[in-house]
């Protein structure tokens, strides 16, 4: 089970980080936190001018594909996404399987104005405090990696700190947990994180079960304008796209190609 393996590795890494940077250190860092929160929900909600939104991902590697982008420079990539009209950025911070780094959030935030997502396997409130200290505006919580009570507790803690939360689901059980926990932003991941198999009909199956008023984000396997138009037509507000962009030499043009209306 790939997800279980990653979560276990995350637990081990987390224990080391807590020793190196105790909770008290993170708490003191907040006193000097220079970051003003950026409006995540506004960035992701549909408008007549921008019927759907793009969360563009800064990602070097993945467990299923290995290294995706050799010439990986997070700030340059972020600037290119801004030129292409990205509404928010997802930044991988998991170091072992995705070759991410928390510092990427801090580096990128200095140069682009859009909200930043800490994309990681968050299982502890310590990681949420880290996200705030390093400059994230919202975090990812994966329903399959958490008990319902844990999901609710972490979601409420993030909101207490002023962070928004994207709750990722892959099946009806995950969705039930997400809704019960109070998720406002629901991410439907076409990729099963236990097997890494793709299920591209998942939005069609789950969207009818989502209460009105939620922001719906589709994730994984997205590479064509036709797919985006189709999924927007059934209720998707935003699309999180990573690998497709990361494999293109010109990520600005890749973004404009997939969303021609993306010239804000």
Swiss-Prot record:
The keyword Methyltransferase does not apply. Disulfide bonds: none annotated. One of its GO terms (molecular function) is phosphoribosylanthranilate isomerase activity. It catalyses: 1-(2-carboxyphenylamino)-1-deoxy-D-ribulose 5-phosphate + H(+) = (1S,2R)-1-C-(indol-3-yl)glycerol 3-phosphate + CO2 + H2O. Pathway: Amino-acid biosynthesis; L-tryptophan biosynthesis; L-tryptophan from chorismate: step 4/5. Keywords: Amino-acid biosynthesis, Aromatic amino acid biosynthesis, Decarboxylase, Lyase, Tryptophan biosynthesis. GO terms for biological process: L-tryptophan biosynthetic process. Its EC number is 4.1.1.48. PANTHER family: INDOLE-3-GLYCEROL-PHOSPHATE SYNTHASE (PTHR22854:SF2), TRYPTOPHAN BIOSYNTHESIS PROTEIN (PTHR22854). NCBIfam families: PRK00278.2-4, PRK00278.2-5. This is Indole-3-glycerol phosphate synthase.
